[in-house]
Structure formats: structure tokens, C-alpha cells
Amino acid sequence: LERADALAEYGMQFGMAFQLVDDLLDLVSTDALMGKPVNNDAKSGVYTYPVLIALAEDADPDGFKALMLGAKDSQQAADELKARVLASSAVTQTLDRIGEYNKLASACLSDLPDSPTRTGLMELPERYLNGILTEKSDPAHRTW
């Protein structure tokens, strides 16, 4: 049961990192790179971790909230919201949080016996993060 618990916790931590990467890609990728529309979270009324970080930092939180609400119906509001998120420290803070989840995921495996599977699982979070962000992010938005 300890092994199952460790793997379940690994999955939880890696899943959190995976979701944050997805949240970032919605902001730092392009339709062409992703093969689907980006900046969709804001248009769908989904307020992701990077958006909430930017809201907390914004000099005009009421204006920022108005953009959050307006993004559902206005491409201009969605674009301005994205620009304000990208101008904040949200990308850097989200990358830091992803790194924390990746470390937690790998730590969950530390008591498992050494094996190629364990090694692969320990490398997976960081390899996924670096690979997908390099492959799918717009170089114009890479600030890391």
C-alpha cells in the first residue's frame, strides 16, 4: 500500500504541474504551435493561476477584473487581459510553482526501489516541462 500511496501522491503533484503548464501555454503559445485556439481560458471565464497572480499585482485591480469579465464577450478585452498577465510576474511565478510541484512529485518516489521505471518517473516532470514549453511556446513570450 505504501508504494500505491507514493505513486498516487506522485500523480497528484505531477498533475498539478501539468495543469499549470497547460495554463501557461494558453498564454505563451500560438494557435499554430498548439494546433488549437489559445487564450481560451479567459474567453471561457476560467481564471487560472497566472491570471490570479497578475490580478494580485495589478495597479488597477478593478480594471483588471472588468477585463476578466469582459474577455468572455470581447476579443479586445481578452487580448488586453493576456498582455497584462504577460507584463506581470505571473509567468515566472507559475514556472516557480511548477518547479515546486515537480520536486514534490519526484520526492514521492524517493523510497521506492531503484529501477528504470522509477528513474523515468523521476525525470518525467522536468522533461515534460522543458520539452513542451520549448516546443509549444512562442519565442516572443519566452521570458525564462
Regions found by a protein language model. Give the residues of each.
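All-alpha prenyltransferase/terpene-synthase fold signal
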Residues: 1-144
